[in-house]
Amino acid sequence: MNTPVFQAGEFSLPLDRTYVMGILNVTPDSFSDGGKYLDPTAALERALEMKAEGAGLIDVGGQSTRPGYTAISPEEEWERIRDVLPALVKKTGLPISVDTFYPWVAQRALEAGASILNDVRGFGPEMLAVAAGSRCGCIVMDPGTTGGDICARVRGFFLDRLEAAQRAGIARERLCFDPGVGFGKTVEENLDLIAHVERTKVEGCAFLMAA
């Protein structure tokens, strides 16, 4: 029996092991490291540190999505990441994920060498179209569904997005699902998700969990 993989551009990540995703916020206002890595040199140095510490892939974002954030424009988001992205691709040797919900930014990120798109809004039609025109991996986050059992809701959202992705021509092995702990959910729902996360997983697809 073949081991399922997460296919992200030229990278094929077997799903019989766990990978650590290093988070690189090229923003002034992220809750964890806002302002530290606005300089491309500092950002690259941090990415290489995370690789040395065991990261198997790097996620870079130019827009904070902390609770209560104020969205910036696609142009400003791209301005923040455009100089560091090619260096990350060239120097780390790791799959580089770009955290964006803007299709315009996503297209430019792929052209700059990103292997993965990470959309906290769950890949609407325009983002699916961008992804379908490439071989990138797609991290699909549940942005906060409503009504009923939280695990069933999240899994239902994932299955809906799986169907939409496949209709767009995106193969199952290119999909990774993130239950979005802390996004659009109550404290009780977040705890329930963490305790019963196996109920939300989609067979044959990668799964991402924030820590």
What are these regions, as identified by a protein language model?
Residues 1-27, 170:
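N-terminal amphipathic alpha-helix/helix-capping segment at the start of soluble metabolic enzymes
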Residues 24, 50, 54, 99, ...:
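Conserved, mostly hydrophobic/aromatic
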Residues 51-52, 110-111, 126-135, 169:
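Acidic (Asp/Glu)-rich catalytic clusters
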Residues 26-45, 70, 95-97, 147-153:
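Active-site mouth loops of central-metabolism enzymes
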Residues 70-98, 103-107, 131-141, 156, ...:
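Alpha-helix-loop-beta-strand connector modules within alpha/beta enzyme cores
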Residues 16-20, 55-56, 90-95, 113-115, ...:
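Short, well-ordered coil/turn segments that N-cap beta-strands
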